[in-house]
């Protein structure tokens, strides 16, 4: 539980959670109230932390190498490539990082050429469809999912 809370704090401090949440919500964002949006952002940030913590469970004692970094002028984003090595092979991870208010924030994580943000948008769009793109109704489902994921993670 303490490890998860540390992961959650790190993600909340270093990921552009609000911006990612808004992008992932898609068209349901515009029809929601301010309170619903704030609740959704908090639920999304917890979902993201749970998702990353769950992925990290399978990793320990891996070695990694920073392979490359480059600045994409068009999108004003820095891309940092790293390779993570394990007994079964290696995996390529690209961090998309953007500067905002004199700080750098992770805006996406691309693992084996698959964007976390694009994947989440697709996943959430399917779930939002089931609530007719009503963000308030979706928040209830997301809270239930977060609670279930949290219990699985700490048990």
Where are these regions (language model features)?
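Early exported N-terminus immediately downstream of N-terminal targeting peptides
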Residues: 1-52
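Juxtamembrane/interface motifs at transmembrane-helix termini
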Residues: 26, 57-63, 126-128
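Surface-exposed aromatic
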Residues: 37, 80, 106
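Surface-exposed, charged secondary-structure patches
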Residues: 50-94, 141, 145-155
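Short beta-strand edge/turn micro-motifs at domain boundaries
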Residues: 90-118
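Low-complexity, intrinsically disordered terminal/linker segments enriched in charged
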Residues: 108-155
């Amino acid at each position: 539980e303490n490890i998860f809370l540390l992961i959650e704090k790190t993600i909340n401090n270093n990921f552009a959670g609000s911006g990612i949440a808004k992008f992932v919500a898609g068209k349901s964002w515009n029809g929601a109230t301010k309170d619903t949006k704030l609740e959704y952002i908090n639920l999304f940030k917890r979902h993201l932390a749970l998702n990353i913590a769950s992925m990290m469970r399978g990793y320990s004692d891996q070695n990694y190498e920073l392979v490359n970094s480059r600045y994409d002028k068009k999108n004003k984003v820095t891309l940092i490539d790293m390779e993570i090595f394990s007994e079964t092979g290696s995996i390529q991870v690209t961090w998309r990082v953007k500067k905002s208010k004199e700080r750098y924030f992770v805006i996406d994580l691309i693992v084996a050429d698959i964007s976390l943000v694009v994947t989440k948008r697709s996943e959430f769009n399917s779930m939002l469809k089931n609530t007719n793109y009503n963000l308030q109704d979706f928040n209830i489902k997301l809270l239930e999912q977060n609670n279930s994921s949290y219990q699985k993670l700490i048990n």
